[in-house]
Amino acid sequence: AAPVPTKFSLGIQAFSLRKYSLDDALRHTKELGFDAIEFYPKMFPITNDSSQIKTVLQKVRDQGLMISAHGVNKFTADSEANRKVFSFAKQAGIKILTADPSADSFDNLEELVQEFDMRVAIHNHGPGHRYSKVLDVLRAIENRDQRIGACADLGHYIRSTERPVEVIRLLKGRLYGIHLKDF
């Protein structure tokens, strides 16, 4: 049987371009051959200002890019603050929120992913972080809505003595993004 062709988008996390202005970061993203950008909050701040959101979205479109995700966003027990992030993402057309959620945020996040039909992708960090191991992420998402999953930062997993191929295998079905880096 012939292999099924797959299309996936390859983007850059804007944090990698944090020393550049928004316009320069978008231009560099396009010049590097990427078709998507994952914004981080300092480059595309969380706001309910529709004019500001439209301006950024137009700049993204002008470069022929799309937004793959937004993060890494902190989520806590503050349901009002969490809702602001989701409302912003909905207005901006962002379907995945890369996140570092506290344990007490998950009940609210579960409600929000259902209400907004968005995904939350837990981003792991290196040794000592609450999500340094793939099992930490799997425990956090266990018995949660399928829209709560992972964004596997493979560089951080390597620092935490995890094997990237095994991480990807274990997160199958709940892996909504991958960050690649070389420290």
Residue ranges and their predicted role:
Residues 12, 39, 99, 122, ...:
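Conserved beta-strand positions
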Residues 1-96, 114, 129, 173:
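N-terminal pre-domain/capping segments
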Residues 41, 126-127, 156, 182:
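Short, glycine/acidic-enriched loop or turn micro-motifs at the edges of active sites
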Residues 2, 57-59, 110, 148, ...:
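Short secondary-structure boundary/capping segments
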Residues 24, 66-150, 158-161, 170:
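Active-site acidic/histidine proton-transfer and metal-coordination neighborhood
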Residues 167-183:
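Aromatic-lined glycan-binding groove of carbohydrate-active enzymes
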Residues 42, 75, 102, 180-183:
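Flexible loop residues that form catalytic
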